[in-house]
Amino acid sequence: MQLTPREVEKLMVYTLADVALKRKQRGVKLNYPEAVSIITVTAMEGARDGKTVEEVMNEARSVLTRDDVMDGVVELIPNVQVEAIFTDGSRLVTVHDPIQ
């Protein structure tokens, strides 16, 4: 199978998000890459599901709380930018203050 660099990157993000969600379910506090991957995948899947940009931003902002992440992670992630594919094309989505 031949994958483009972008496809490889997406695959890595999805794989990390899968591991991170399993850790979250077990009550393990998430680190920076795990938190970013969950927020990113939530935004990408929301766009794929046909949601609006505003709906995607709100959903991605509500997927994690301070209790889900290690100390200091919230301050490391002031925003997350994701290029998501919506039904009408690709858009850059910025999720401000993604961990509440």
Swiss-Prot record:
GO terms for cellular component: cytoplasm. One of its GO terms (molecular function) is urease activity. Pathway: Nitrogen metabolism; urea degradation; CO(2) and NH(3) from urea (urease route): step 1/1. One of its GO terms (biological process) is urea catabolic process. Its main location: cytoplasm. Keywords: Cytoplasm, Hydrolase. Its EC number is 3.5.1.5. The keyword Cytoplasm applies. It catalyses: urea + 2 H2O + H(+) = hydrogencarbonate + 2 NH4(+). It is found in: Cytoplasm. Belongs to the urease gamma subunit family. HAMAP family: Urease_gamma. NCBIfam families: PRK13241.1 (NF009712), urease_gam (TIGR00193). Heterotrimer of UreA (gamma), UreB (beta) and UreC (alpha) subunits. Three heterotrimers associate to form the active enzyme. This is Urease subunit gamma. It comes from Edwardsiella ictaluri (strain 93-146). The lineage of its organism: Bacteria, Pseudomonadati, Pseudomonadota, Gammaproteobacteria, Enterobacterales.
